Amino acid sequence: LLCSFAVKAKEELLLGEKVKDVLVTGATGGVGSIAIMILSKMGYDVHAVTGKKDKNDYLKDLGAKNIIDRKEFEGESKLLEKGVWDGVVDTVGGAALTKILAQTKPGGIVALPGNAGGIKINTNCMPFVIRGVKLWGIDSSGSSIKRREFVWNEAAKLIDFSKVQTFTKELSFNELLDVYPKLLKGELSGRTIVNPNK
């Protein structure tokens, strides 16, 4: 939810200029799935990035307008590419972020809540200096109580919790040992919660 409000902030920063096209990476993961749901409910055209071709229907059901293969964000990037994205929720980070920044439109906001693709990026100043792109780190664990209360009040309006239940799994510590290799291979989707009392 914090990511979605970061993207929405572009409208306030640019005095009402409307956000239209929003990119969400790691779209089948827990954060990506919820971001798609929220951003589509906010009225944006959500473009979901995934490497899991069997999840297209799942992503469309969450509200994605378009599905993009993550391979589109591999390889070398120019200093600046055609501006495509008004906003981005990048749960992946790493090498793909370089290309994403180069493709973000003037004044665009890239919210970065994760680093599943790596902690390093190889970028340049051009997206920031020429286009005024903003890269916002999202740290939900360090948010104030006031901010958390605001977010949870908004969550009730923007999140379909019955859908969240369909992609959330609860595991015991013992079950985690079986699931962890799949996580490392990128074979999991949705949200996995470890319940120490299970």
Which positions does each model-derived feature cover?
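Short, flexible, glycine-rich and Lys/Arg-enriched loop motifs at helix boundaries
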Residues: 13-20, 71-85, 142-143, 163-164
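C-terminal hydrophobic helical "lid"/dimerization subdomain
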Residues: 146-198
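Terminal peptide-recognition signature
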Residues: 39, 59, 88, 100, ...
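Residues at the starts of beta-strands that form the adenosine-phosphate
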Residues: 21, 45-46, 109, 134
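Short internal alpha-helix immediately C-terminal to a glycine-rich phosphate-binding loop
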Residues: 1-41
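Adenosine-nucleotide cofactor-binding segment
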Residues: 40-95
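Short, well-ordered alpha-helical microsegments
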Residues: 32, 56, 97-98, 120-121, ...
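Glycine-rich phosphate-binding loop and adjacent beta-alpha segment
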Residues: 95-161, 196-197
